[in-house]
Each structure stands twice: as structure tokens, then as C-alpha cells.
Amino acid sequence: KPIPFDPEQAKALLAEAGWKDLDGDGILENDKGDKFKFEYTYASSGEIAERLARFVKDSYEKAGIMVTTRPVDWSRYQELLKLRDFDAITMGWGANAPESDPRQIFHSESVKEGGDNFVQWKSAEADRLIEKGRRTMDEAERMVVWRELEAVIADEQPYTFVRVAPWLRFVKRDFGNVQTYRTGLEPQEFFKTSATPSPAAN
């Protein structure tokens, strides 16, 4: 279940943690006078990235947190990712159809080189559920396990999920067994229903 967008509740929780607007400028400070601020780095690859950057900035500032946006080109963005030279970033993950194996992104073993647990999140409960789900052959039972894993991820927030992009796919009529899933299509399930026409004789 997504965490609701509630700037006032965010301010209340931050106040409990010692962050308050002490000088009336709309930005939270701690008892040392340090402003609550961070830099948001993103790849300036188009309109969606720019709109998302504005959304992040506006949303946080409603809770009294100052955000400086830092657009960079794709090659520089990859360098910064590798160096981990950023305060906050946006990343995009694509899902396989009909379901994705969460081990590569969310298991603690995937923190190691070669894995994609880029945020280095470790959770014994998540590991247990991932291993259980991968051993569960019955699809309905496996979906129950994945829902439990989703609840752990939603609670611990290794990522804050912002959007799901719509998708549009075209498939020729002479392909059969085309199944649509919430995450897309799986071309390996397709089969051709008619022979490919031979080229016309000269």
C-alpha cells in the first residue's frame, strides 16, 4: 500500500526528529541552524525527467525541505552512479512478463559486484521471502509470497516508487499465444500461426 502524500504529517514527524522552521523562512532547520536540504541529480533525457524533477522539488518544499535540482547528461549520470556522487537520484526499473525475479534487485546477495541491489539494502525478511518465492512452484501461492515481499519493501522504502509508465506494443496477426500481462508481453511465448509467404517467382 503506497505511503500517502501528507506534507503536514511529514512536518510533524520531522519536528519530532528535531527539524523545525526556526527562522520563519519555510525551510526546516535543526538545533544547530543547519538547513534541511539536498541535491537531486537526474539524467536530463527529456520532458518526463524534467517534469519529475519539478515534482520532487515542489513536493519536498511543501514539507519544508529545500531541494536543488542537478540535471546532467547520460554519460555524466552513469559516472556519478558509479562513484555514488549524489544526494538523491531517480532510477528506472523494467519488469519482465509475466513476473520478475526480485532476487537481482532486492536480495542482500545482490549487493555484491554483479548484482543490481544498487542501494545496498539488506533485509533478512526480504531475503527469506525471495528464497521462499523462488522455491514455490504453485503460481497462486507464489503470488502470496511476492505480496508479502512487496509489503516489506513498502515499509522499509529502499526505493520510493514514483510512477509506472504506460506501455504500448504491436504484434503481427500471424503470431499466436499472445498473452498480455500487467507488466507487458513475453515474446518467448509467441508462436507463428502461418508459414512465412515465399517470395514471388521471377
What are these regions (language model features)?
Residues K1, D6-K11, I48-D58, Y77-N202:
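Detector for C-terminal structural segments
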Residues D23-L28:
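Acidic, glycine-anchored loop motifs typical of Ca2+
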Residues E29-G33, Q120:
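Flexible hinge/switch segments at interdomain interfaces of large molecular machines
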Residues K35-S45, V67-R70, D87:
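Short, well-ordered beta-strand elements
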Residues V56-V67:
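Short alpha-helix C-terminal cap/hinge motif
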Residues T69-E79:
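Short helix-initiation/N-cap motifs at beta->coil->alpha
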